[in-house]
């Protein structure tokens, strides 16, 4: 828990971390059981892919394709009905809560805070997997919270109130809270949803830098085809609960496949850097 007033935190410079991870998803499937008997049951899978530290992976697909459902399986919030999801050889759903939170951080779609918090207090909440019950934060907690703020360029925000931040500032602080957990696997559910184009590019650049420099495996649920192509190493493409393609953007971005998935007339052209660009026909 944070001490009253948030306390003065040490001002630290982030250094490249040692996080490295191997995520293995093997024939994982899941089903949402409908509460209304007349409604169809949504089924995801089977899904298979792997991800490593220093990789930025996008989970792409239209609404109701299973992207967020897959993320809850990766985070261990739900258990696959069949198949396995492992992090460094450990089955995610079998990990004890604190042990899982020390390996995996999930940034869900933005929700309202129940009570006002300063940025520093909010980021310190990310240290819960390491804190003993009814204890104030330790020097080590402050060290990692300060490093997390530095990693996202939010040092100067530490004394601000969360409800006074802009959309881009708030997204950086939410990311810092996740980084304070010291995860090796970072999962984000549509983090660009409320950002303008400049904010979206800045966030993807930051995630790319976190993967490259701090060796996280980063997985992002997004609708942003072009940004995913530009910044991500690999794509997991979902459609109606099925995993259609897994591969590099150049391997996945086939015109006929994307038109089927997104139900729109599209063109795919290659940029000089070898990454595909998707153009909506008639735009």
Regions found by a protein language model. Name each.
Residues 75:
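Helix-to-loop junction immediately C-terminal to a conserved catalytic motif
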Residues 186-190:
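Catalytic Walker B motif of ABC-type/P-loop ATPase nucleotide-binding domains
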Residues 60-62:
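The feature captures the beta-strand-to-loop junction immediately N-terminal to the Walker
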Residues 261-283:
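ABC ATPase nucleotide-binding domains
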Residues 161-165, 169:
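Conserved ABC ATPase signature
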Residues 182:
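Conserved catalytic motifs of ABC-family nucleotide-binding domains
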Residues 83-91, 100:
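Conserved ABC transporter NBD signature motif
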């Amino acid at each position: 828990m944070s001490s009253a007033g948030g306390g003065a935190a040490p001002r630290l410079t982030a250094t490249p971390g040692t996080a490295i991870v191997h995520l293995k998803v093997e024939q994982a499937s899941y089903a949402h059981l409908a509460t209304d008997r007349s409604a169809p049951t949504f089924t995801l899978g089977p899904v298979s892919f792997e991800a490593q530290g220093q990789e930025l992976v996008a989970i792409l697909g239209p609404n109701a394709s299973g992207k967020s459902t897959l993320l809850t399986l990766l985070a261990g919030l739900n258990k696959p009905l069949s198949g396995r999801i492992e992090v460094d050889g450990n089955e995610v759903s079998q990990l004890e809560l604190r042990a899982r939170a020390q390996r995996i951080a999930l940034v869900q779609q933005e929700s309202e805070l129940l009570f006002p918090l300063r940025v520093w207090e909010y980021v310190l909440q990310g240290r819960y997997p390491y804190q003993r019950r009814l204890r104030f934060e330790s020097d080590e907690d402050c060290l990692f919270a300060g490093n997390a703020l530095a990693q996202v360029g939010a040092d100067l925000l530490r004394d601000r109130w969360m409800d006074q931040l802009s959309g881009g500032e708030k997204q950086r602080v939410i990311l810092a809270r996740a980084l304070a957990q010291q995860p090796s696997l970072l999962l984000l559910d549509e983090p660009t949803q409320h950002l303008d184009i400049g904010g979206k590019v800045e966030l993807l650049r930051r995630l790319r830098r976190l993967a490259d420099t701090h060796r996280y495996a980063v997985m992002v649920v997004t609708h942003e085809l072009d940004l995913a192509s530009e910044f991500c190493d690999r794509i997991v493409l979902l459609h109606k609960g099925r995993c259609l393609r897994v591969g590099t953007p150049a391997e996945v971005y086939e015109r006929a496949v994307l038109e089927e998935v997104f139900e729109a007339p599209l063109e795919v052209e290659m940029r000089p850097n070898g990454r595909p660009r998707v153009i909506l026909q008639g735009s």
